[in-house]
């Protein structure tokens, strides 16, 4: 019996065959299935759960070509057995404009909620955990099913970052990263975003983190405030991005005073030192080291 059911997105025959070619060296391990419907719909995840018979499920979230490195799937199986994780995801390379660049991902932490958390395009699931998670989803989704599944799995299992470069993505979305970061405010994505919010709300209720939207009117005229607003940045090990984040705040022009609060969660990669360099800035920067 083969150990992995691979579900590959099918757009057209040429594209699909390119994806299948990545698994030519792993035919003894994998069953390959064509996936013609969106991976982000509940019906699709239910279909996968019904069809999967192997111990593990491999999903690709992109329809573009990739290259699996030597014994990549054997390594994922080994780590899945060792960790008993519900989901494994790995560091990888990307080829952009004919150049190969490193694309490391980060550890999944308790409380991670971002619907655009970067797992890379290869997701490796424990089949039993996958099936239980899918059948426990409370409502049907057209866009947020995979997000809701990941949140569900995180409540009961480990989601493990494999700190090894196991594959290479052929990147075809050449927009600048800043353009991608603000996809969520695009009006065309409004329905998708509403679904993500519903999935997140269900998760927060499940973990006891949901706060009812009950508000008390506050009269801000009763007490004078030296600072009208605060920008708060929670951070851990973001040496490559924290400088840009601070600079974006420093460049804001207002007719009122505001401060910047950086909550540093035990960074050990040089992030703390970069934050401290800005303590003398005219802007009030408060560095809280948890």
Feature annotation, model-predicted:
Residues 129, 139-164, 200:
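A short, conserved alpha-helix in the catalytic core of glycosyltransferases
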Residues 18-32, 247-257:
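Short, acidic, metal-binding catalytic loop of nucleotide-sugar glycosyltransferases
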Residues 200, 286-290:
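Conserved small/polar residues in nucleotide/adenosyl-binding loops
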Residues 4-13, 230-241, 245, 252-253, ...:
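A conserved hydrophobic helix/loop-capping motif in glycosyltransferases and polysaccharide synthases
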Residues 57:
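Short aromatic/hydrophobic "clamp" motif used to bind/position activated sugar donors
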Residues 100-127:
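A recurrent flexible, glycine/aromatic-enriched loop bordering the glycosyltransferase active site
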Residues 65, 70-102:
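Conserved donor NDP-sugar-binding/catalytic core segment of glycosyltransferases
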Residues 11-15, 38-39, 61, 65-66, ...:
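A conserved acidic beta->alpha catalytic loop
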């Amino acid at each position: 019996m083969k150990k992995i059911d691979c579900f590959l997105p099918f757009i057209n025959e040429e594209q699909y065959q390119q994806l299948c070619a990545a698994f030519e060296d792993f035919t003894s391990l994998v069953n390959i299935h064509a996936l013609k419907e969106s991976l982000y719909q509940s019906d699709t995840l239910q279909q996968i759960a019904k069809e999967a018979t192997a111990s593990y499920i491999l999903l690709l979230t992109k329809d573009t070509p990739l290259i699996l490195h030597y014994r990549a799937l054997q390594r994922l199986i080994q780590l899945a057995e060792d960790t008993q994780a519900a989901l494994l995801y790995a560091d990888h390379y990307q080829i952009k404009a004919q150049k190969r660049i490193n694309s490391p991902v980060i550890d999944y932490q308790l409380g991670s909620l971002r619907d655009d958390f970067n797992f890379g395009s290869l997701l490796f699931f424990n089949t039993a955990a996958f099936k239980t998670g899918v059948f426990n989803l409370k409502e049907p989704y057209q866009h947020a099913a995979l997000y809701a599944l990941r949140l569900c799995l995180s409540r009961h299992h480990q989601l493990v970052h494999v700190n090894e470069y196991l594959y290479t993505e052929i990147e075809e979305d050449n927009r600048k990263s800043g353009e991608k970061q603000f996809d969520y405010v695009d009006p065309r994505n409004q329905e998708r975003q509403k679904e993500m919010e519903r999935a997140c709300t269900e998760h927060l209720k499940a973990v006891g983190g949901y706060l009812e939207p009950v508000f008390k009117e506050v009269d801000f005229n009763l007490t004078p405030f030296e600072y009208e607003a605060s920008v708060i940045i929670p951070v851990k090990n973001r040496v490559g991005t924290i400088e840009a984040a601070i600079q974006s705040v420093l460049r804001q022009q207002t007719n009122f005073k505001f401060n910047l609060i950086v909550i540093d969660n035990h960074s050990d990669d040089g992030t703390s030192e970069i934050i401290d360099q800005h303590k003398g800035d005219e802007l009030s920067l408060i560095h809280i080291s948890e």
